[in-house]
Design a protein with these regions (language model features):
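Conserved functional hotspots at enzyme active or ligand-binding sites that engage polyanionic ligands
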Residues: 1-111
Length: 111
């Protein structure tokens, strides 16, 4: 399922396990494709299995999105991580799901 040859994210819509202070956690890469390869820090949104029913959450399913378990992307937890924090690629979201990511991010930020 993962691509172990890469050392960090290169494309928006990729899901990775990344080192965080709380241990390795799944994240969604939000950085634009031309930028993700060239900068030292990458903009990501955290994934969690805890659903709160918020406007700022987008549900992902194991069946449709090839994630290890059903979860949500939490756009209230957007931050940057150094490229060196990325451990293992999980999958890449489909273009249709990536469109939903952008719509949910827009709805959650209001801009």
């Amino acid at each position: 399922m993962g691509d172990r040859r890469r050392t960090g994210p290169t494309r928006r819509g990729e899901l990775w396990f990344a080192a965080t202070p709380g241990g390795d956690r799944p994240v969604l890469v939000l950085a634009r494709d031309p930028v993700a390869d060239r900068i030292g820090a990458v903009v990501v949104a955290a994934l969690t299995r805890t659903r709160r029913g918020l406007l700022s959450e987008l549900e992902l399913t194991a069946a449709e999105d090839r994630v290890p378990s059903d979860c949500v992307v939490n756009f209230d937890n957007v931050h940057t991580l150094p490229r060196t924090a990325f451990r293992r690629k999980i999958t890449r979201l489909s273009p249709a799901r990536l469109h939903q990511v952008c719509r949910t991010l827009w709805a959650s930020t209001g801009c």
